[in-house]
């Protein structure tokens, strides 16, 4: 949202016209706090089919919309998922990660929670790249037709792997297995 909003809108409109899924990440709480960035996000929102973020970004979005400060992450995700869309080819899905707490998925009026992989505090090395790794794992399963539970499991695996290493690095061989 901070750069090339015109390009984002062109891709968003094209995706809607071609009935392709358009995915966005909330990116950072400041996006919702800086008026030009928030305006760009809200212009894009009707085109977003999959929105991913973390609990801090979801709370910042809710605050920027004037929603009650005591809303749960599940309620925020549900409310965002029901916001108006430009196309009807698919429901909007909102996925919110919550660190050590379950990942929330809201779509079609339903909210589900998906467990993360437990990790002892002493195993936590570096959280940089965890959100990007989660999205990579999530999308890797969605593009091959897996359901939200399996996609979240892959996303949580990728994030869990990243946070146990310095920098955004992976082991030579993954240990993820498909359900």
Annotate each language-model stretch with its function:
Residues 1-113, 117, 168-179:
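Ribokinase/PfkB-type carbohydrate-kinase core domain
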Residues 82-93, 100, 117-179:
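Conserved post-catalytic alpha-helical subdomain immediately downstream of the catalytic base
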């Amino acid at each position: 949202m901070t750069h090339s909003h015109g390009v984002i809108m062109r891709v968003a409109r094209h995706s809607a016209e071609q009935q392709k899924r358009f995915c966005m990440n909330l990116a950072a709480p400041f996006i919702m706090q800086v008026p030009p960035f928030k305006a760009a996000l809200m212009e894009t929102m009707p085109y977003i089919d999959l929105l991913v973020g973390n609990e801090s970004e979801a709370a910042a979005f809710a605050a920027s919309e004037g929603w009650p400060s005591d809303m749960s992450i599940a309620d925020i995700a549900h409310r965002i998922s029901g916001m108006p869309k430009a196309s009807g080819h698919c429901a909007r899905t909102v996925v919110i990660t919550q660190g050590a707490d379950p990942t929330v998925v809201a779509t079609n009026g339903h909210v589900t929670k998906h467990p993360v992989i437990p990790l002892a505090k002493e195993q936590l090395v570096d959280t940089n790249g965890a959100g990007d790794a989660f999205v990579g794992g999530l999308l890797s399963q969605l593009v091959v037709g897996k359901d939200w539970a399996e996609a979240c499991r892959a996303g949580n695996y990728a994030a869990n792997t990243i946070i146990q290493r310095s920098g955004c690095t992976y082991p030579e061989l993954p240990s993820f297995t498909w359900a």
